[in-house]
Amino acid sequence: MSQLETRTEPMVVNFGPHHPSMHGVLRLVVTLDGEDVVDCEPVIGYLHRGMEKIAENRTSVMFVPYVSRMDYAAGMFYEAIVVNAPERLANISVPKRASYIRVVMLELNRIANHLLWLGPFLADVGAQTPFFYIFREREMIYDLWEAATGQRLINNNYFRIGGVACDLPWGWLEKCQDFCDWFGPKIDEYEKLITNNPIFRRRIEGLGAIGRDEAINWSLSGPMLRASGVPWDLRKVDHYECYDDFDWDVAWEKEGDCYARYRVRIEEMRQSLKILRQACEMIPGGPTENLEAQRMAEGKKSPFTGFDYQYVSKKVAPTFKIPNGELYTRLESGKGEIGVFLQGNNDVTPWRFKIRAADLNNLQILPHILKGAKVADIMAILGSIDVIMGSVDR
């Protein structure tokens, strides 16, 4: 080994793959000069399960339950993207009501994702108390999912080509609005505890700073990109689903450090609440119980039996064939841009199914921003990126 400026030999330390701060089975081979990080080599692949090859040997309907095992904090986002790709390739329309239901589920998942990021991140930097608070709110989201889909964290299997698996249960939208009313003050509570806490701010301000051009050149996305001064959100850029119907703002900051990434995610939860409240009020047909009452009262000629009031355009047969052609479709998850490149050959299984995971791209900048940092800051910087290794390794 070559000698360093301190006239000592560099020390190589392994973090993980079995370490509570690794957020999964991630291994970091870190070279240290005393307390300073000289080099860092992430070692991934411990959780590789061949998801793309599984997708290429399953029909579009069969693969939906698999995807929530990739990023188990963002199962709804992956369900959405794997049905969006065949929909676009086959030109299948989605009813307005189904699109609203999808948006509600996606925004609930965004909040759950950020909460699952917030608790462990704060625990990494020494704030243990909020770690227990976030599980209280996440349980309420899981209760809503359980009522609508039958499952809680993963294996919701709710999204379908052309819509969703079933309409919302009676009283569900009211419960969702109750959650919004409950959760808004809780965000204020988090901020009161954390945001201007001088110990917390001194711990993470200025850490892992990424400039605007760096973020673009490293192909970052999501809060990692928006915290570096780039207000890029695919919900605004690509106009998918019905996000254009709602009044909301893109959360972004300029500093590019761990603290900026924290503030972006806090603000995103507030914006998700705005979208949820509007979606619950504006959903075509209103609550399911009201919609069914209107249909029964007015009969088959009721306008509420029209296309935009359905929860699915047409139930796709198990023998649904993906048309010839190829496309790339993407959406904004809690971690950033997730996408699917789909190549069909007029068969029930895709010829090629390539998955783009946001956290894999975001993780690649880690060695770059760790150089020169202190060994105690490794966990704070890694935690601010928000990685789930099931999604990174696939």
UniProtKB/Swiss-Prot annotation:
Membrane topology classification: Peripheral membrane protein
Pfam family, one: Complex1_49kDa
Purpose: NDH-1 shuttles electrons from an unknown electron donor, via FMN and iron-sulfur (Fe-S) centers, to quinones in the respiratory and/or the photosynthetic chain. The immediate electron acceptor for the enzyme in this species is believed to be plastoquinone. Couples the redox reaction to proton translocation, and thus conserves the redox energy in a proton gradient. Cyanobacterial NDH-1 also plays a role in inorganic carbon-concentration.
SUPFAM superfamilies listed in its UniProt record: HydB/Nqo4-like (SSF56762)
Species this protein is from: Prochlorococcus marinus (strain MIT 9303)
Reaction equations catalysed: a plastoquinone + NADH + (n+1) H(+)(in) = a plastoquinol + NAD(+) + n H(+)(out); a plastoquinone + NADPH + (n+1) H(+)(in) = a plastoquinol + NADP(+) + n H(+)(out)
PANTHER family the UniProt entry points to: NADH DEHYDROGENASE [UBIQUINONE] IRON-SULFUR PROTEIN 2, MITOCHONDRIAL, NADH-UBIQUINONE OXIDOREDUCTASE 49 KDA SUBUNIT
EC number: 7.1.1.-
Enzyme class: translocase
Assembly and binders: NDH-1 can be composed of about 15 different subunits; different subcomplexes with different compositions have been identified which probably have different functions.
GO CC annotations, alphabetized: plasma membrane-derived thylakoid membrane
Family, per entry: Belongs to the complex I 49 kDa subunit family.
Gene Ontology biological-process annotations: photosynthesis, light reaction
Domain of life: Bacteria
HAMAP family, A to Z: NDH1_NuoD (MF_01358)
UniProt main location, coarse: membrane
Protein name: NAD(P)H-quinone oxidoreductase subunit H
Keywords for the protein's UniProt record, in alphabetical order: Membrane, NAD, NADP, Plastoquinone, Quinone, Thylakoid, Translocase, Transport
Localisation per UniProt entry: Cellular thylakoid membrane
GO terms for MF: NAD binding; oxidoreductase activity, acting on NAD(P)H, quinone or similar compound as acceptor; quinone binding
